Amino acid sequence: MTRMTKSSSSLFDHIYPYIVITVTITIVFHNSLDCDFTFDDTSAIVQNRHVHTNETDWFRIFDVDYWGTPIRSEHSHKSYRPFTSLTFRWNHLWSPALNPYEFHLTNVLLHIIVSFICFEFLRIMLGPQNRWPACLFTLYFAIHPIKSEAVTSIVGRAELLSTLFILISLFCYFKNAYINFAITVLLASYSKEQGMTTPAICIAIECLKLMIQFKSLNYLPFWSRLWHSLSNLTMAKIIALIAYTALLIGTRIYLAGSSLPIFTKFDNPASFEETPSRQLTYNYLLPLNVRLMLWPRWLCADWTMNSIPLVKTFDDSRNAWTAIFYLVFIILSSRAFYLATSKQSKRLFNIEIDIERSNLLISLILIVIPFIPASNLLFPVGFVLAERILYTPSIGFTTLLAIGWLRIQNYFQRSRFIQFLLNFSTILMLVTFTFRTYERNFDWHNDLTLFKSGLMVNPNNAKLYNNIGHYYERRGEWSEAIKYFRLAADKDQEDIGAELNVARSLIRLNRLKDAEDLLWAIKPRVRTSILKNRMVPQYLNIWINLAHLISMNQTRLHEAENLYQEVLTIRSDFVDAYINLGELYIRKRLFDQAQETYEKALQRARHIDDGKRADIHYNLAIAKSLKLDHQQQKPSGSKLGSLLTEIAQDLMIAIDINREHREAIINLAILLQRPQFPSNNQNEYRTFAINALRSYSRSNELESFQFNIAITLLDIGGPTNRMDAIHHFKRAAELKPDFRSALYNLALLYYDFKDYEQSLFYLNRTLEHYSNYTKALLLTADIYSRMERLDDTEKVS
């Protein structure tokens, strides 16, 4: 009995930290399950057709960035996270209606798993005897308020997954499971770019081993010590890690088209400053990140634009915080190096490192290396501060605090008051964090609550006003949208985007004159901005918006054409200009010019978005079709067949690119019904059309699609296809009970099968809605005659 009790107690001691972690995270983050898709979730999931399982093939995710833009496009932010996007696709597979609940639940579960692994890591770093402190500081990691963005924002899954795989890969590496290490590093890198820092963490620890080995050979001459240190397995590991890192980075650069993303001064103002302002501001951001970890009172989803004033001179008082940060960092680093490289005896995994003396240095490595890519110190990034990017470095920060906590506890182990104070203050901190994180999750309930909470922290951030304006814009509340767009323009006079938003909303309110005057007023400023800064592709939309507005007046089409031509002189590969110019030519019945414009778009525009490429091929098919219909001398025979085939191929390309392109699908089905369509490979085209119609109908069931499937099946012919056609005609009639063509075709088919009762049933349904429909009346009379129901025949006649 005693043995069983001890065994049960031991088991409970082993699992209780996991129970505590799970219950705590569930309590703190359960309100995140009720949140909507917010902020970047919209572009990464809701509007990203590559996440929607019914629209594209899964492998297309590897061709696009996190937001669904082709990775090589200049419009791409170059955030390449295909594995994270695949998990969104899996969520969509489970919840085709795009219910955010499943997405949020997945994030919370992933956070629990990461916290479990963090607990195991802390147990190693603090020593297996310190389970309580390890559990305590795992809770610090798990419920810290900055985790709200990574967990409650669905796109924060990139941080969750990359951190998960980084930790697993470190365990694999130190267990000598190098193949598993390589695989998990790849998964970490394809979850988020910071995963590529994992080999660098291992390199830093291997370098620590080299230093220890070098010092242990102090009885040898310097060059002999150096040779012995470098000519061993440790050095081979470092070389292999460097090679693997180079391969990862090289592949990543190749996939991105060997170009960096284009950011504006509104994304990261310091990037556009001269020396020393740029460097002073970048370095000032370092203590601000530490402040977020130590005092997470002021949290905001967006710190861009004027949220943090630039540090322009050396006499700015904020430089004192930078100096304090570097002073503390140097002291900690010096102490860490001293402890790690002296009196080594124990082993970390299979590495001859005293974990008790090296844990301080390892914690600093885990803070610094994963943070470097987001620090602006190597290259500019598209944000100033971002709470989510601290998710991985916070493991190192948590370890650092836990080490300090243990040192204080051990130093004052005889003082009950200090011990009580230490435990009480720690628990108080965790309780405070619990309430703050729970409160912060409510900010992420929807876009409006999120951005309004941001204005409480950063009232000078014009982007937040713009985002609130977009929220009201999506709801059709145009006046309220204009109010916030104008507030954004007032906060930053250089923010041309806000004024473009105002103009767009004015158009929606039918205040066309006001919108046109505003667009003409800001057009010269856009040209100046293009000359001063790197070109912002979105600003070119002023020409599109202005031309579109002018083209509403049929007498001003020439002005609109000139605007499209003007913007193409600025950017000869501007796809939107080609698309709109082609549509303008179609309106002017200049079908040759329209065709030429669309062909030029396909030739000149690089890395076109899939949706736009599909639209161009569709528009090209329409231009060719209209050109054919309006020719005075219509071609005949093989020439006509060749032109119809060419049109069909353009439509098929559009459908191949975008399986949800409704217009292309329906026009292809109609085109194939033309009697002039060549018989060569006709069934192949019709089979393609049927598959496209069925694929679309699975998610967007429309009576017109069911009808066209049936007609195309009849064109292919054969008893099986005719029976299948009946099914689709019936479905069309169910979706639209007064669908005359579907009802009449059903009657015809049953007439052909000599099933006169069924034929009469559908004829009667047709005549209920269309009592004077001649064809139905004649067919009814014919059936009555065949059935020798002469009285009924006379009534119909």
Each predicted region: which residue ranges?
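Polytopic membrane enzymes that build or remodel cell-surface glycoconjugates and lipids
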Residues: 2-527, 531-541, 545-547, 580
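C-terminal luminal/periplasmic domains and tails of membrane-associated envelope-modifying transferases
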Residues: 2-7, 11, 448-797
